[in-house]
Amino acid sequence: MSLLARAISFAYVPEKYVLTEVTVEVERGEILFLLGANGSGKTTLLECLCGVRVPQHGTVLLDGRELFKLSARERAKYVAYVPQFPEAAFAYTVEEMVLFGRAPHVGPFGRPGRNDWERAYRALALVGLDGLSRRPITTLSGGEKRLALIARGIAQEAPYLLLDEPDAHLDPANQHRVLSVIANLAKEGLGVVATTHNPNSALLYGKRVLLLRAGKTLAEGAPKDALSAELLKEAYGIPFQIVGDGVGPRAILPKVEG
């Protein structure tokens, strides 16, 4: 059981591809991190995996079925997507925002039931926002809004969870909380794909990494292999140093000259 992008290419402008023949697969029960410089195609790849974007070439398979042959509601039952910068048009409460994650499981004219509310509150508790459930979403800090959106994705209870920079705009404690929650969800059987600009998030929490450069796959594999100093320099254009403990890499830092 997996979510597979097979040789996909995508262009916003005809023939100017931001993704070129990228193949990547995430299985249920693992975390895959997407890394690369700004403009390397991370978010576009994530959007192709969830059906927001349709690649001009290649295909996306959801547990062996073609993703784009499913209705939007059916896709949402299997793939939850947490974008980076959605803005709430209305001052919904935090609990109402998270409850939207239950929409694929409620009929078009139905109302959320007790089961849906329980799952929304469970998701809020997981990210530590249960004490803010009645607050308008517009009154939260940037980091708290990120946590609320991640809770909405968790409440959706899809077998695949896709997150665009879940560790962005968070203090170290909340970064650890969110990444630990994601890691535990993977242990429970979810397939997780997350973009990040922090190689250490992938090193500490990821099972596999896809490193992109200019819309093409530069490296794929275990973090300790795909995040070498040489490959990171090729991806980002600056030198890196790998700090180890004699057993394996423990931290990745930009190398400061002088």
PLM features per residue range, with description:
Residues 58-66, 75:
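Conserved ABC transporter NBD signature motif
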